[in-house]
Structures are given as structure tokens and as C-alpha cells.
């Protein structure tokens, strides 16, 4: 990966070791509902999958987040982004996350795990008073049912886990199996496309 997109060469060896150790610890013993994705060639590229917490409009989704470490990390906080589209008061249109832990409440010893847990907590308890998405913040405060419906619909459209197809056709290279597998996939794609169009149409009405 080009250093143009990375701060790895600007971090001290001690910081790199510390970050890598924490990521490996989280991979071995993951926090509940969080799976860290390690890029061993660039520890400044930190991504994780967060399960939408039960009892929230995000419950059925899996959300991909990214942390970008600055060259002064851990003295300065990283920037955090949702790579998965989400309707949330504290998430901007470009995915940037607004949370006090990454601003005025930042402390150098908090660590990556604490940041990811804080982001997960933000899905449970949004903070509309410091909204980056003003529409979502206002809707949450004034029309919670509409907010919940909109957030749930965005989750169903954008945050669904990728389901692997049945592997039988892959194991059997017979032309018949290949043909049926192709037809099944086309039918599934059409159904999915139709469902997405219906949901997007409903979103526009909100």
C-alpha cells in the first residue's frame, strides 16, 4: 500500500507495536459484537465489523467502520468513519463519526478497543445534541417512530451480511448444475433488486 494513504512510516516503532498487539488481542478475544480486521502491512488502516445492537433500529445489520490514525497518535485521537451507510444523528454524510471520546474526552491511554466499544454504544444511545446529521437528530427528538423506521430501513438496505451461496454447484462441475446455479443467482439478484427499489421508494416518501 502506498504511503500516500498511510501514516505508518510516521508512527514510532513503539506505537506500531502497541497498536498491533492490541489488534491481535482483539482478534484472539474479540469484544462482544465486534470483529477487528487486521491489515498487517499497514496498522494505520484499522477496520472492524460491528453487529447492530439488539433492541435498536440497527439490530439486523453488520456495520463496517474504519479508524484513521494520525501521525501524532496516540497523543491525538484517530478519526472514525462508518464505511457502511447508516442513518444516525452522529454520523455525517461522508461517514465521519462525532463522539466526545474522539474529541474533548480523548486520552492517549484509551486504546482502539475503547474506541470501537464507544462506537457500538453510540448505536444504542445516539446523542442528537451534537448531531452531524441534523435531519436524523431532529427526527430522533421529535418523531422517534419515523426516525426508527428510517434507520431500520437504511440498515436493511445497506448493512446486510453477505450470504454465501450453496457450494454444491461448485463441487459438481456438471453443466446441469452450473446452469441451475446461474439461473438461481439471476432470480435472487432480480428479487434483491426489486426489494431495494421498493425500499428506496419508501425512503423518498419519508
UniProtKB/Swiss-Prot annotation:
InterPro entries: Ub_conjugating_enzyme (IPR050113), UBQ-conjugat_E2_core (IPR000608), UBQ-conjugating_AS (IPR023313), UBQ-conjugating_enzyme/RWD (IPR016135). The active site is at residue 98. One of its GO terms (biological process) is cell division. It catalyses: S-ubiquitinyl-[E1 ubiquitin-activating enzyme]-L-cysteine + [E2 ubiquitin-conjugating enzyme]-L-cysteine = [E1 ubiquitin-activating enzyme]-L-cysteine + S-ubiquitinyl-[E2 ubiquitin-conjugating enzyme]-L-cysteine. It comes from the Eukaryota. Residues 165-191 are annotated as: Disordered. The keyword Nucleotide-binding applies. Pathway: Protein modification; protein ubiquitination. Residues 14-160 form the UBC core domain. It is an enzyme of class 2 (transferase). It holds the Pfam family UQ_con. Keywords: ATP-binding, Cell cycle, Cell division, Nucleotide-binding, Transferase, Ubl conjugation pathway. PROSITE patterns: UBC_1, UBC_2. One of its GO terms (molecular function) is ATP binding. Residues 168-191 have a biased composition (Basic and acidic residues). Its EC number is 2.3.2.23. Belongs to the ubiquitin-conjugating enzyme family. Catalyzes the covalent attachment of ubiquitin to other proteins. Acts as an essential factor of the anaphase promoting complex/cyclosome (APC/C), a cell cycle-regulated ubiquitin ligase that controls progression through mitosis. Acts by specifically elongating polyubiquitin chains initiated by the E2 enzyme vih/UbcH10 on APC/C substrates, enhancing the degradation of APC/C substrates by the proteasome and promoting mitotic exit. This is Ubiquitin-conjugating enzyme E2 S. It comes from Drosophila mojavensis (Fruit fly).
